[in-house]
Design a protein with these regions (language model features):
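Short amphipathic alpha-helical interface segments
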Residues: 1-9
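A short alpha-helical element within helix-turn-helix/winged-helix DNA-binding domains
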Residues: 12-22
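Alpha-helical residues within the helix-turn-helix
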Residues: 20, 37-38
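Beta-hairpin "wing" of winged helix-turn-helix
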Residues: 40-55
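C-terminal regulatory/oligomerization modules of transcriptional regulators
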Residues: 63, 81-143
């Protein structure tokens, strides 16, 4: 998503190009864009100039909505990931308030970070060679 955000609005970018730029496998990217397209966060375009594009301005996306589209719940424990806490132990669970507090902090943070902010951290498209900095797919510049 951050890679798409660096382009002009409406610009379609191929997964192959993103794969090469971010040093991620094409198969992995396909697994990521499927749920994003399903909920309308990206739009796919077919054809020789095909690829994916954002459906709104990068400032209008939050990291939270992107993560939830891809991962589902971001709750730290399963019983907080459902609308109704169906855990039979919830009334006796002495750690539930801790997990609920952590869940609240996580959600507040990821909902406060925009795609525009994330994309601003990417190196310029024509910068020096990049390599993956970790399994998250982020990049770092080689010096």
């Amino acid at each position: 998503m951050a890679e798409l955000a660096r382009y002009a609005p409406g610009t379609t970018v191929s997964l192959k190009e993103i794969s090469e730029r971010q040093n991620l496998s094409l198969k992995y990217l396909e697994q990521i864009v499927t749920p994003l397209a399903r909920v309308g966060l990206v739009k796919s375009e077919r054809g020789s100039q095909g690829g994916y594009r954002l459906t709104k301005d990068p400032a209008d996306y939050t990291a939270g909505e992107i993560l939830r589209a891809i991962e589902g719940s971001v709750a730290p424990i399963p019983c907080l990931g459902s609308v109704t806490n169906e855990c039979p132990m919830s009334e006796q669970c002495f750690t539930l308030p801790f997990w609920a507090g952590l869940d609240e902090v996580i959600n507040q943070y990821i909902d406060s970070v925009t795609l525009e902010q994330l994309a601003s951290q990417l190196p310029a498209p024509d910068s020096a060679a990049q390599e993956s900095c970790c399994s998250c797919g982020g990049t770092k510049n080689e010096k």
